[in-house]
């Protein structure tokens, strides 16, 4: 009886496929329990998102509470700095990105095909500006994700100015919760403190010259080109199938596209699996009308789980965050099974777009010359 093919006889392509599959599913099942539970971070996100929706339910307008909770979600996850000054800087950047994204979404929304063009241009400009500095890179990625999510809400909102105000109020409320709980947590040594990064000593002129020089290289354009190409494809697919709810493709593209290309295929696949699992979980949560108290409890619970899962499991964190996003953008309406199936398909389409764009862009990246390779 002949033995099966040995490892040495496997083709390189098959070997890479096996290795990649192990990396994706192995990484999805990994669980890092080294970090201690941080009740302060969980309290910030639970109160930041739970209180606005509670107020909305109490006054009989859950959609108002959901809009404010959306702004809180964009800010509440800010890591706690070692000092109030450092914490304020982190929270301030998140608040600015959230409000700017809400304003951009309100301006771009409800203009037909021009809205798609506006999103692509705004996201591309933000991605390009993100190369100016590391803080700008972080802020630009937040802006892109927030604006894409916000556009989906603003597209179905009759009063977009009120939506911006509610999102801003939720963001400011979450910022106050974070700063207040942060002061108490530092005073009583509760939870963990994010490691502070050393601020750059380069002047604005030096950063600008460096950024302008980088714009002459493909590395500076790779992320903006990949992102805008995928968003344009997402808009085209949604327009080609108007009977489906494929606006989620753009949201998934914004969530899945990364500036850094290290292990991108494995990370995108893991996050796509997490989003798909989150969509399936949403069916169990919201396929039937939820009473007000249940909506508040579920949103507060999912919000509290997010910071706890963030450093433990990439897959589990994404799976918990996805129902949160879907509930907050639902306007308090029941999420039907057809919508969930469409969003599951949209997630897979987005993952395919992001990975394809990366593989195409990688062909244009300059290969390191043999002289520059380290020996050994």
Q: Which sequence ranges carry the predicted segments?
A:
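Alpha-helical transmembrane segments and their membrane-interface boundaries
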Residues: 1-143, 147-320, 328-376
């Amino acid at each position: 009886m002949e033995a099966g093919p040995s490892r040495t006889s496997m083709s390189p392509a098959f070997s890479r496929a096996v290795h990649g599959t192990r990396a994706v599913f192995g990484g999805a099942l990994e669980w890092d329990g080294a970090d201690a539970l941080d009740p302060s971070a969980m309290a910030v996100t639970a109160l930041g998102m739970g209180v606005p929706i509670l107020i909305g339910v109490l006054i009989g307008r859950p959609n108002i509470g959901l809009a404010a909770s959306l702004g809180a979600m964009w800010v509440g996850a800010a890591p706690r700095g070692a000092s109030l000054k450092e914490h304020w800087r982190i929270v301030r950047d998140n608040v600015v990105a959230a409000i700017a994204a809400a304003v951009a979404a309100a301006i771009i929304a409800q203009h037909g095909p021009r809205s798609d063009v506006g999103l692509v241009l705004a996201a591309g400009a933000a991605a390009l500006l993100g190369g100016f500095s590391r803080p700008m890179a972080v802020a630009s990625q937040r802006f892109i994700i927030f604006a894409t999510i916000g556009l989906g809400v603003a597209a179905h909102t009759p009063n977009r100015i009120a939506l911006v105000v509610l999102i801003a109020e939720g963001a400011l409320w979450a910022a106050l919760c974070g700063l207040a709980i942060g002061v108490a947590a530092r005073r009583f040594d509760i939870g963990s403190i994010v490691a502070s990064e050393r601020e750059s000593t380069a002047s604005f002129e030096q950063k600008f010259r460096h950024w302008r020089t980088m714009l002459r290289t493909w590395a500076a354009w790779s992320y903006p080109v990949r992102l805008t190409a995928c968003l344009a494809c997402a808009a085209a697919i949604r327009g080609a199938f108007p009977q489906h709810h494929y606006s989620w493709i753009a949201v998934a593209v914004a969530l899945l596209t990364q500036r850094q290309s290290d292990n991108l295929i494995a990370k995108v696949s893991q996050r796509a699996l997490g989003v798909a699992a989150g969509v399936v979980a949403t069916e169990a949560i919201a396929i039937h009308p939820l009473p007000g108290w249940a909506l508040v409890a579920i949103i507060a619970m999912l919000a509290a789980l997010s910071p706890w899962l963030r450093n433990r499991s990439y897959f589990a964190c994404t799976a918990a965050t996805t129902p949160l996003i879907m509930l907050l953008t639902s306007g308090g309406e029941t999420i039907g099974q057809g919508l969930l199936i469409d969003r599951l398909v949209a997630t897979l389409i987005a993952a395919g777009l992001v990975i394809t764009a990366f593989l195409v862009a990688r062909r244009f990246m300059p290969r390191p010359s043999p002289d520059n390779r380290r020996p050994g």
